[in-house]
């Protein structure tokens, strides 16, 4: 099935709010094996919304709108959809009941009540995180317009609870979707290795890159879940076999989730010393459930004095080699492990930019070290062509640190080579 997304909100056009809704919906459609044709963004203007809606209905089987379902005058998505589809708004009794339950004994303003009015013939989607229900409105035979609230905290539960099951039923098939996640190979190299697998129609195999990682989604359709999984799993195994040990998991949330689980399984602890990443690595670890079992100390040692006082980095080493050096990265990893009683220590120091670089130590140069009781490993991240920004450099460095620890605990070589312009050891 073909789908289009229409994101509604002037704040999106002005850049005041990042359009994460389209990303969430796009990922959900991809997981269902649907083809996303276009994403439109329109302001709070009924005429422009109507034009975008009519254009989308000429091409797509499913049109999904996000935003514009609230109680204010500029929330006009339902009214516009009702007009375009010829489905007048009607009070939806169950939505009204839920709205009254939400407000309890508090008075409900008249404009709040309009949220319980839905286009005639709609299938309502309850909003367990807010007041505005979503709905699916039938268009011509086999066509639907799905209306979702704008706040991600409301949209995401509705997607999971109501929209995805609805679309699965409408598609007449059960979808099995697997995400193979990798770090250490570029999209081009990966695509060459799995080129023949991407030619299949069921399952489909689609590689794409994000945040210096490369993902491969395998999606199969069948009459039931068991049959869909049986179609997909041999292809997932083939992808893993072709890509090798750069694969760090299937249907996992990220490198940090894998590392925390490895630490828990091995009953090992981690301490971290960061300079240029400013606590990002520690944040990624502590975002994971169960992190407190394996992670006790995370230090941001920006200043040389902090590196010496808190980690034991020798002053003469800093004076001789500078804070951004392999020697200091190693000392940070060893110092944080030894001083704070952990099994593993990670140290990161570099020039995240955009300023501060020199000819000898350019912007983007980062040293990442991993220490255990009997060894220290180092990766050097050197700038590869165009500087991609401070956040990119910090994210990449933290991912390298996680990957080094992941590989060590899996019994793989830590100082691996890199392809497609990723940093070289």
From Swiss-Prot:
SMART domains: MoCF_biosynth (SM00852). InterPro entries: CinA (IPR050101), CinA-like_C (IPR036653), CinA_C (IPR008136), CinA_KH (IPR041424), Competence-induced_CinA (IPR008135), MoaB/Mog-like_dom_sf (IPR036425), MoaB/Mog_dom (IPR001453). It holds the Pfam family CinA. Gene3D superfamilies: 3.30.70.2860, CinA-like, MoaB/Mog-like domain. Belongs to the CinA family. NCBIfam families: cinA_nterm, PncC_domain, PRK00549.1. This is CinA-like protein.
